[in-house]
Amino acid sequence: MKLIVGLGNPEKRHENTRHNIGFEVIDEMARLFQTGMTTGKGNFHHAKITHRGKGVIVLKPMTYMNLSGHAVVAAMNFYKIPVEEILVICDDLNIPLGSIRLRAKGSAGGQNGLKHIIQCLGREDFARLRVGIGRDHPSGSYSSFVLGKFSEEERKTADSIIPECAEAALDFVVHGIEHAMNRFNRKNA
């Protein structure tokens, strides 16, 4: 069983913000498999899917971004999923909009959702898919940028990368992180 986690913030006011692109990828995966999200035991929404004979839980923490680790650990414990079988999808303001980067492990890189997951797990060695939300942000306070909505032009670019993110996550499910990295990472990311 694999666990694919898309990070974001709950509440309607956060929909379509840069910070919620992880949620959008999970929604795309649920759409592809024609399933809806249900409330899980641990402050998360999830759906169970099967892809090429492999069981997958797609999950959206219903905590705020900075507390995502609680929902991830709850799901891992409930479904008995080891850390080697999880992929976390999040926004990254250091990657150009329209680019993605997969990694087998690493630091939080300033992403507070990843930071909390690392804190709760006590380790950094879990796979992640970072979705670029743009490097063209004002210096200083990044919170207004990541919590802001995409411009109309940016939204088109974001919408075009979401299916690729879902495909990369499904590649991870079938072939593992190394294969997904080799297939989807690009030099410009």
From Swiss-Prot:
The record marks D91 as: Stabilizes the basic form of H active site to accept a proton. CDD domains: PTH. Pfam families: Pept_tRNA_hydro (PF01195). Hydrolyzes ribosome-free peptidyl-tRNAs (with 1 or more amino acids incorporated), which drop off the ribosome during protein synthesis, or as a result of ribosome stalling. Catalyzes the release of premature peptidyl moieties from peptidyl-tRNA molecules trapped in stalled 50S ribosomal subunits, and thus maintains levels of free tRNAs and 50S ribosomes. This is Peptidyl-tRNA hydrolase. The active site is at H19 (proton acceptor). GO terms for biological process: protein quality control for misfolded or incompletely synthesized proteins; rescue of stalled ribosome. GO terms for cellular component: cytoplasm. TRNA binds at H14, Y64, N66, N112. It is found in: Cytoplasm. PANTHER family: PEPTIDYL-TRNA HYDROLASE. Belongs to the PTH family. It catalyses: an N-acyl-L-alpha-aminoacyl-tRNA + H2O = an N-acyl-L-amino acid + a tRNA + H(+). Keywords: Cytoplasm, Hydrolase, RNA-binding, tRNA-binding. InterPro entries: Pept_tRNA_hydro, Pept_tRNA_hydro_CS, Pept_tRNA_hydro_sf. It is an enzyme of class 3 (hydrolase). Gene3D superfamilies: Peptidyl-tRNA hydrolase (3.40.50.1470). Its EC number is 3.1.1.29. The record marks N9 as: Discriminates between blocked and unblocked aminoacyl-tRNA. One of its GO terms (molecular function) is peptidyl-tRNA hydrolase activity. Monomer.
